[in-house]
Amino acid sequence: MKYAIEVNNLNKTYDGFTLKDASFKLETGTIMGIVGENGAGKSTILKGILNLINIDSGEVKIFGKDFKENEMEIKKDIAVVFDESYFHDNLKIPDIDKIMQNIYPNWNKNQFLKYTNKFKLPKDKRVKDFSRGMKMKLSIAVALSHEAKLLILDEATSGLDPVVRDEILDIFLDYIQNEDCSILIASHITSDLEKIADYITFINDGQIIFSENKDELIYNAGIVKCSEKEIDKIKNEDIVGIRKNTFGCEVMVNNREHYENMGFVVDKTNLEEIILFTVRGAK
């Protein structure tokens, strides 16, 4: 099996925050979503992968090669979109096109202009006059225009209206129709990840809680409706989290069919509820 990214035991300590032994693998030709609350460590992982911060320990391989040792070679095949624009305020779209031609040997001007037109970005305006959403669309247009094999995206769809967001998600899905291309996307918008991701990596307080196939994760999870006394019938290792209310209890389990077969009422669930129960559903 080929991997676009392999992260092994990544550690980084800041004042008041520690990323602890982060490990996961992104299979080539797939999309992985990294989800977690603000401050959970999503951006730290991405910056650690890209060698934008000095990690304390750990190893990152991209396309099977040690990233630190082969950074310049590998970077030509990576596109990165962070949640803030990195273009100078005075640049216009034609200026950016010329700059990128000198940076990327595989720069595709026609592709770039296709996306800037699709996103309705004005060619005569300077970046400083763009809205936040327009700046994000510009960054995405650049990322998709130099034949990168790996997209690394940090909150790339935040600040966009739902229609444009949906359009961009479809573009990402089209991008990975090329089986050599992969996407790692960090986002707090779980509905976006539920639509496009093949795998979900959930990080909380600097620690990866799980990294799993998204469809299997959602299919296997369910919410058992029961009384407080009936909780004793549910195996502790099957419990993701518990919510109590005036009508009884809601218990998220990771083995839905088993409890349906036991006669419990079990509701299907979604990624957002899985995250909420994992973080806030006290066992």
Per-segment meaning from a language model:
Residues 151-155:
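Catalytic Walker B motif of ABC-type/P-loop ATPase nucleotide-binding domains
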Residues 82-138:
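ABC-family P-loop ATPase nucleotide-binding domains
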Residues 35-37:
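The feature captures the beta-strand-to-loop junction immediately N-terminal to the Walker
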Residues 5, 19-21, 75:
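Conserved structural motif at the start of ABC-family nucleotide-binding domains
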Residues 169-253:
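ABC transporter nucleotide-binding domain
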Residues 50:
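Helix-to-loop junction immediately C-terminal to a conserved catalytic motif
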Residues 58-69, 73-74:
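Conserved ABC transporter NBD signature motif
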